[in-house]
């Protein structure tokens, strides 16, 4: 089954329902992670006069990661210059404490400051300050959460990154770029025809995607900052499933210009494609490994869609998935340890994950219409689209499936998520 056929199936299943579009979400966290660090994030002094509640955003980020549990801070009135009474916070059950302030500057910007404390050891773990315009208050909060996450887990936080996704209302399709929590969504492109397969470039400056605006699937790249588009692949037949190489110089794409759907590599600026494999089967949905040496892809060469692997320059093909008769939509974690994919189980499409070193396979959702998994750049969460309780939703999940966050709001056709890379600060 080709990428285009797969995508059209999901469009008919969900995008044909005609719900109103939604551009922002609220975060609803459910489930229990295996290990959660108790942290108190006190209300920031002065944040009542700001348009964003910094402490609430920080706490929501940390809880959504599955590694933190919020501790009640009711009655606390502290800021980053105050040394807290550690005994009080230990009694409340906190292992760490974040304090801060928000001050309006004379030029209209906001000065956001914070400090992190190790309550158990009584140690100052450092802090930062940000002078930001009003529109960047949420970004400042996400960066605070990144700092806290890295200090307490040793892994880089991904809260200040972005996601891309597609919505449909009536006959209007929109490509959106939003914060990793779904807020602050901005429309990047609108079309009366379907938009599918958004894929972030490695440096986060561009999105590749497929548009049907010319009544056939065509691959474009889109500059996120200025909105400029470049036509990449408009060959005879279908052009679909763009995937960036780690160096950003090449796109792997699926083309049917020579007959069946086959894998090609094409310069990221456009040009003549180079065929990667010779096969009479349908090969589609390529994705590069983080080192750029291999490509995972979907093929029906064994009779039904399964995930395979081959060298990125072409060569011998190796089958990867064996559990289940129908496996599609591969996504590789940035650390190279995990493969997420969608498996059809008794007619239901469920998110699965493979630990590549051991080959261990786990189903991590109990929903039945999952699609388009994409890893956070720190490899600790997966974003995907699904239906839950009859509603279309974007979800994030921990890799063990123990804690999920529904990025929910109004009903809407919200699809095709892709998680962007770390941003330069």
Where on the chain are the PLM-derived regions?
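Amphipathic beta-strand/beta-sheet edge segments enriched in Tyr/Trp
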Residues: 25, 82-147
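Structural motif
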Residues: 109-111, 171-176, 216-220, 260-264, ...
């Amino acid at each position: 089954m080709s990428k285009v056929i797969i995508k059209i199936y999901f469009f008919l299943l969900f995008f044909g329902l005609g719900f109103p579009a939604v551009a922002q979400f609220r975060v609803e966290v459910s489930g229990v992670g295996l290990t959660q660090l108790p942290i108190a994030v006190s209300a920031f002094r002065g944040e009542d006069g700001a348009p964003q509640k910094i402490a609430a955003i920080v706490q929501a980020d940390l809880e959504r990661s599955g590694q933190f549990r919020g501790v009640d801070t009711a009655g606390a009135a502290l800021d980053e210059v105050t040394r807290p009474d550690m005994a009080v916070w230990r009694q409340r059950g906190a292992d760490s404490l974040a304090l801060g302030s928000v001050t309006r500057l004379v030029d209209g910007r906001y000065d956001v400051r914070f400090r992190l404390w190790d309550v158990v050891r009584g140690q100052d773990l450092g802090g930062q300050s940000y002078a930001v315009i009003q529109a960047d208050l949420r970004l400042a909060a996400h960066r605070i959460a990144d700092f806290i996450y890295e200090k307490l887990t040793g892994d880089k936080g991904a809260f200040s990154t972005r996601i891309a996704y597609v919505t449909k209302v009536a006959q209007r399709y929109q490509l959106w770029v939003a914060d990793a929590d779904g807020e602050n969504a901005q429309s990047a492109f609108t079309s009366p025809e379907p938009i599918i397969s958004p894929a972030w470039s490695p440096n986060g400056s561009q999105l590749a995607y497929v548009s049907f605006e010319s009544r056939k699937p065509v691959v474009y790249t889109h500059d996120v900052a200025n909105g400029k588009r470049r036509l990449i692949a408009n060959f005879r037949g279908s052009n679909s499933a763009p995937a960036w190489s780690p160096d950003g110089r090449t796109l792997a794409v699926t083309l049917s210009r020579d007959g069946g759907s086959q894998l090609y590599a094409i310069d990221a600026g456009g040009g003549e494609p180079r065929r990667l494999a010779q096969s009479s089967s349908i090969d589609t949905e390529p994705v590069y490994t983080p080192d750029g040496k291999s490509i995972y892809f979907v093929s029906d060469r064994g009779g039904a869609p399964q995930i395979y692997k081959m060298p990125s320059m072409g060569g011998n093909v190796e089958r990867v998935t064996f559990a289940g008769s129908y496996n599609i939509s591969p996504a590789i974690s940035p650390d190279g340890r995990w493969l997420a994919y969608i498996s059809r189980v008794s007619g239901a499409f469920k998110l699965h994950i493979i630990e590549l070193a051991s080959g261990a396979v786990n189903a991590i959702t109990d929903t039945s219409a999952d699609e388009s998994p994409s890893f956070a750049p720190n490899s600790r969460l997966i974003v995907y689209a699904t239906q839950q309780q009859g509603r279309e939703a974007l979800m994030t999940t921990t890799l063990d499936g123990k804690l999920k966050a529904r990025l929910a709001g109004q009903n809407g056709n919200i699809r095709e998520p892709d998680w962007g890379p770390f941003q330069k600060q």
